[in-house]
Curated annotation (Swiss-Prot):
Zn(2+) binds at residues 256, 259, 358, 417. It comes from the Bacteria. Pathway: Amino-acid biosynthesis; L-histidine biosynthesis; L-histidine from 5-phospho-alpha-D-ribose 1-diphosphate: step 9/9. Binds 1 zinc ion per subunit. It is an enzyme of class 1 (oxidoreductase). GO terms for molecular function: histidinol dehydrogenase activity; NAD binding; zinc ion binding. Substrate binds at residues 234, 256, 259, 325, 358, 412, 417. It catalyses: L-histidinol + 2 NAD(+) + H2O = L-histidine + 2 NADH + 3 H(+). Pfam families: Histidinol_dh. The gene is hisD. It comes from Chlorobaculum tepidum (strain ATCC 49652 / DSM 12025 / NBRC 103806 / TLS). This is Histidinol dehydrogenase. NAD(+) binds at residues 126, 188, 211. One of its GO terms (biological process) is L-histidine biosynthetic process. Catalyzes the sequential NAD-dependent oxidations of L-histidinol to L-histidinaldehyde and then to L-histidine.
Amino acid sequence: MLTIYHFPQDEAALREQLNRTVSFDPDAQRTVDDILYRVRTEGDAAVLDYTERFQGIRLYDMRVPEAEIEAAYAAADPEFIAILEEAFANITAFHRNEAEKSFFYEQKGGVILGQRVTPMEKALLYVPGGKAAYPSSVLMNAAPAQVAGVDEISMTTPCDAEGKVNPHILAAAKVAGITSVYRLGGAQAVAAFAYGTATIPKVDIVTGPGNKYVALAKKQVFGHVAIDSIAGPSEVVVIADAGAEPEFIVMDMFAQAEHDPDASAVLITPSAELADAVRETAARLAGTMLRGEVITRALTDNGAIVVTGSMQEACKVSDMIAPEHLELHVDNPWEILPDLRHAGAIFMGQWSCETVGDYFAGPNHTLPTNGTARFFSPLSVRDFVKHTSIIAWSKSELARTGEKIARFADHEGLQAHAEAVRVRLKHL
C-alpha cells in the first residue's frame, strides 16, 4: 500500500509517484463551457434546467427561506451548535489579526499619498454538498469575509433530490451570519453568481472548494469575478523523527486519504525503523476504517514513505512537494521551521494534528493544493478586500516636478500625457 523511497537515490521515482499536475479532461471542459454560455445568455432558465438535469429536481425557489434556516438551527443538537459557535469565534479571532488598515502619509511640498483598504460588496461562498456535508467550510469561508466587512455574503450548496439542504450546513450558515442561502450546486451555480441572473445577485468574489466542474467553472469566470483558488485533492506531508508515534502518523495520513482516491499522504523521516513501523501500521489498520477502500487506493496511488539522510534533507523533500498540510512530528518543531518555506499550513508537534486545523484552531483550512503553496496562500481577509491608491499632488510640487514628468511622457511618445501636465504648468 505504501512504498518506501530513499532520498536522493529514488528522487526520480518519487517525483513520478507524487506528480500532482492538474489535468482536466476535455469532455468536462466542454461541458463547463456550455453551462457558462447558457447561464450567461439564458439566466435562471438555464440554471433551473441544469439543476434538474444534474441534481434530479425541478426547483421553484432557488433561495432557501429564512424559516427553513431557522428551523434547522432550532432542531440542531445544542451541543453541536455550541461547538460551531466556539469554532467560529476561534476562526474569527484569528482572522481579525489579518485585518489591514488604510494608510496616508505626507511628503515634502504638501503631497499626500496613501492606500485605502475597502471591502468587496458581495461574496459567494460555495459549500460542497452531495454525500458529505461540510459545515466547517461554511465557517472557514464566512469568517474572513465577515472580518473584511463584506456587505452581502451569499452561500450556495447543492440540495438533495427533495430540494432540502443539509441541516448542519444551514445551522452553520446561521452561526456565521450568512446573508442568503441558495440550494444550487455545480458549475451552473458558479456561473449564476459570476454573471448574475434575474433572481441571483452578481457577486465580486467566489470562494470555496468543489468538484472538477466547480473548479473549472471558477477558473473560467475569473476576470468576471475574483476567486480564491482552484482547489485540488487533499494532501498532507508528515515530517517525523525516530521518536514519533507511528499510530499518530498513520491516522493523520488516513485523515487525508479518506477524502478522495486522489488524495495524497506522505511521510518523510530520517528513521528507517519508523518508516517500517508506519508502513506496517497502515497496512494493519486500513481494513478497520469505514472508508478503508478509498484510503488504500489513495495511499497506493498517491502516497509514499520517504527515508532521508538527515532532517535537513527531509525539509528539502517537503519543500519540493509544497504540500497543502505539513505536520512536524519531531521533538522540537520550532528548530526546523526556518528550514521550511512551502506549505499551506504547518502543524507544530504531535499534538497539533491536522484535524484541529480543519475544524477548530482558527487559521483557515482553505489552503493551496497541487504544489501551489509555492506561490498561493490560505484564504484570508485579504481575499475579500481591495486596495486603492490615493494621490494628492500639490500645486507647488507640480511646479517643481511637472516638466520632469512631461519629459518622461515625451520619451514614451505619449503626447497627451505630457500636455496634461504642461497645460497645468501654464496656469501656475
